[in-house]
Amino acid sequence: MKFIVKPHPEVFVKSDSVRKRFIRILESNLRSIIQRETKGVEVINRRDHIEVTGLSDEYRDVTLAVLTQTPGIHHVLEVKQSGFKDMHDIFEQCLEMNREVIEGKTFCVRVKRRGNHDFTSIELERYVGGGLNQSVESASVRLKNPEVTVKFEVANDKLNLIIARHKGLGGFPLGTQEDVLSLISGGFDSGVSSYLHIKRGSKVHYLFFNLGGPAHEIGVKQVSHFLWKKYGSSAKVKFISVDFDPVVAEILEKVDDGQMGVILKRMFMRAGGMVAEKFGIEGLVTGEALGQVSSQTLTNLRHIDNVTDSLILRPLINWDKEDIIDLAREIGTEDFAKTMPEYCGVISKKPTVKAVKEKLEKEEAKFDFSVLEQAVYNARVMDIRDIEKESQEQAPEVEMVSELGSDVVVLDIRSAEEEDEKPLELDGVEVTHIPFFKLATKFGDLDQSKEYLLYCERGVMSRLQALLLIENGYKNVKVYRP
């Protein structure tokens, strides 16, 4: 198993010292994740690219997933590496790999070469292409728009025959940009905006203003943990939860209805600024898009920005909702967002779209700011890696089962994509697939005389979902951990 990792082109327009630092950080990020997820896989920095090698293909899929989900990588070449004697030896190796691929098709040969050789790249392309054309009668050469492009690289004394080219995430390596604090609600927008800053190289910490109780917090923890685990697990980041119920109660009691939405957002930013200052974080990230709701007009956004010195970043400011949902689907947060309640939208019945500074200040003068300060003071700060541990601690009453009886039903709560990749098949045991985001609404329709065991890959989601079902009064739920 061998992969050649090509950093994003923007890395190479930096000065030599910055470029070297960025690639070292990318190397470190990859090594920390790959060593955790695999055994015997090496990560080697080759200055202008990174090589990832393993003695066997045992960890091929896991390694490829890490490489295509790590920020800072433009593309990944999956290669077969060997030595060579001369151009004819290279041709014979290319023929062995590509004979069936080019049969009955048009093709061309493209070569990248580094090092000192007695041939040029063009000479090598012509030699190999001519040889393939003569050896495979049904194939024909077409230099423009061929059906197949035979690609390989010659690096000094090594030949890299390209098996496949995999698109990377792009962006900058995680940790090359300053940290940001994402105001995450679990919906489409905040998840996508968090992802975009991870992709751009920032360590994203998560700040959650809890307006919906334990169930809402568990849901937001799930999506935050998912984003970190899939795209940013080389970084140590925080998940911070602030109970905003007292703040909302104060607003509902003392603030005019039309100003409530903007004032609530101003309270979010004030609290976010306090938390960011405490942890030395320069920027707040939100999922706001221009005109999407009443508080997101230019006038209102300006009034919201004015309450904090922290830089407010809005990567989705000009995005259409449809495009946001499409990206959420692509990165895997759509299923979380579909079932995440939106509590902010119900706070104001007749929201203003063009708030006036004097009116806002008049209404906020009625507000007891010690309530906000106390809420921030009582904020719960945790390492996002502890969410998995906490799910075990929060649900001690959820029984873990490793052996199955014939009278139980196993509920596979993974996403359809995960279930398709690794179907769960158990001899003599009924297995039903209900994605986690449908479990809350579908579970009540099941035969409640039966016992149900929830299953997911790592056991995090299954424990959290079991806790929610038990809190809702269901006692016939356990977690299956084979």
UniProtKB/Swiss-Prot annotation:
A molecular function (GO) term: ATP binding
The name this protein goes by in its record: tRNA sulfurtransferase
Protein role: Catalyzes the ATP-dependent transfer of a sulfur to tRNA to produce 4-thiouridine in position 8 of tRNAs, which functions as a near-UV photosensor. Also catalyzes the transfer of sulfur to the sulfur carrier protein ThiS, forming ThiS-thiocarboxylate. This is a step in the synthesis of thiazole, in the thiamine biosynthesis pathway. The sulfur is donated as persulfide by IscS.
Cell compartment(s), UniProt: Cytoplasm
Pathway: Cofactor biosynthesis; thiamine diphosphate biosynthesis
PANTHER family in the cross-refs: TRNA SULFURTRANSFERASE
Domain of life: Bacteria
Cytoplasm in keyword set: yes
First-tier enzyme category under EC: transferase
Gene3D superfamilies xref list: 3.30.2130.30, HUPs, Rhodanese-like domain
Naturally occurring in which organism (per UniProt): Aliivibrio fischeri (strain ATCC 700601 / ES114)
Disulfide bonds, paired cysteine numbers: 344-456
One family name in Pfam for this protein: ThiI
GO CC terms: cytosol
Main location, first listed in the record: cytoplasm
Residues in THUMP domain copies: 61-165
Catalytic activity: [ThiI sulfur-carrier protein]-S-sulfanyl-L-cysteine + a uridine in tRNA + 2 reduced [2Fe-2S]-[ferredoxin] + ATP + H(+) = [ThiI sulfur-carrier protein]-L-cysteine + a 4-thiouridine in tRNA + 2 oxidized [2Fe-2S]-[ferredoxin] + AMP + diphosphate; [ThiS sulfur-carrier protein]-C-terminal Gly-Gly-AMP + S-sulfanyl-L-cysteinyl-[cysteine desulfurase] + AH2 = [ThiS sulfur-carrier protein]-C-terminal-Gly-aminoethanethioate + L-cysteinyl-[cysteine desulfurase] + A + AMP + 2 H(+)
E.C. numbers: 2.8.1.4
GO biological process: thiamine biosynthetic process; thiamine diphosphate biosynthetic process; thiazole biosynthetic process; tRNA 4-thiouridine biosynthesis
